[in-house]
Amino acid sequence: MRFVLHPAADAAYVHYEGSHANPFEPGAAGVSRVNGWWLAEAALLSYWPPDIAIARFRSAGMETAFIEQRGVQCYVSVASAFVIVSFRGTEVNDFQDVFDDARFALVRWNEAGAKVHHGFREAFERIEPQLADALALLGSERTIWFSGHSLGGALAVLAADRFGRAHGVLSIGSPRVGNAAFATAFDARFGAVTARYVSNRDLVTRVPPRRPFGYEHVGELRQIDVEGDVSGAAPPVLAPAERIKELARTQDALLDHMPRGYSVDIWNDYARSGD
């Protein structure tokens, strides 16, 4: 449970191990398996402080800038042909993060009727000006990819939608971000290049609920089952009696949220596939 709540406490983890033998595919049409691993590693590494994270991104061939604004943090990692923007997820000892997560009323996102989570929108808009400046300096010759875990996954989705330059988006263990109008419009633009990984019964991916609030997920579901296999099939809907039993296993559902677990499972899926 410690690494769920405090991922950076995992001092033994080696980020991007084997990255030079398994290079990123900057021109891939969407989130290929190897790109999924690179993006998951970036999402995981976003929990580490900049004095460590920047060196580890560099070990994989990326020069990185750290951006922070009132508790919202992201890394902009630049290689010769691509850029990865990775957002840090919720830190339970950060009051602003918890406050952002808790404000789940839907608020307007654009003029087309799309609405999004109030706290997520405000968190994104705190960091948006600095991130926009950083991306503008990079020009247009590199493909841009967004990633994040938990709250970070929600911010990655909002960033892709707002900036409109996403070659690919990865969310791991992400909550729902907006209403049906937002999801429909987002998927029309980026659904084919957005991978939404869900580990087994990760509790965070089920909130905010569809009813009565009207939230919907975006992107292509990539479900990781209890054996670590990845497919597009969601877990079966449980009968009422099974739901009660599952409530007693809340700790298991929280353990499914661990970002390291996502990165390892995504790597294993890539390694098994051979592509």
Regions found by a protein language model. Give the residues of each.
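Non-catalytic, mobile gating and regulatory segments of ester bond hydrolases
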Residues: 1-147, 151-275
